[in-house]
Amino acid sequence: MDCDNISLQGLDQTNPCDNNQSGVKTAFLCPVKDILAINATHVSSPTSLDDFVTIGASTLDRLAITCKPGKGFVKIYSADDMGELKYTQQGTILGCRSWKGALELFHPGFKRTAIGLMAYINNQEVIVVAKLNNGLYHLLGDMDRGAKLASGNEMTSGKAATDKNGINPVLEYNCGRQQIFWDGFDPTDATNGIPILSAVSADTGNDDTGNDDPEEVTGT
């Protein structure tokens, strides 16, 4: 990659007319083994700081991510003020530093579908598309190194009647730089979005065909 043409940009006060909301409420997840290709990539010769972390700098003429036939992403709902995406610098030697991305979600409801999802991805790598409340979509994972559940993830039934209950996954991904989809990216777009599986009730774990395979974990 050629970085010689990047022009630095100053960081002025945040525009009060922009969407500056914090948090994450929605994420999409798919096991790496179910993905054929990630077509949205960094530009080879970025010219701005935005370019440096943007993937698919302009809208693609194909899906941003291609899955195997019959496979796709599931949507995960996170409760208000309970979802967060954080990047932490790691490494001490200049030239060897990188980032650890950590996406934390809380899906309310200690139900079979949610518990089953955690059990299913416990020992495998996944690709995650996180929708931030500010409108940006971040990609965690690549074909060589997917995101993984961090150690110590919790699922809880709660104790008191007023306690929260549900799953609290934290998905981690080590990366050299962030992967943020282009402005205007829409995961549901049939041309350049991502394959998303049909909705399934989180209460019953059943879809409208009577199958008991978890495909989506949504709020109720």
Where are these regions (language model features)?
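Solvent-exposed edge beta-strands and adjacent loop segments
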Residues: D2-I6, T14-K100, G146-A161
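Mixed-charge, glycine-accented linear interaction segment located at domain edges/termini
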Residues: R145-G219
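Generic structural motif
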Residues: L11, V32-I35, P108-R112, N133-G135, ...
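N-terminal alpha-helical "arm" segments
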Residues: M1-L29, N192, L197-N206, G210, ...
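Structured, beta-strand-rich domain cores
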Residues: I76-G146
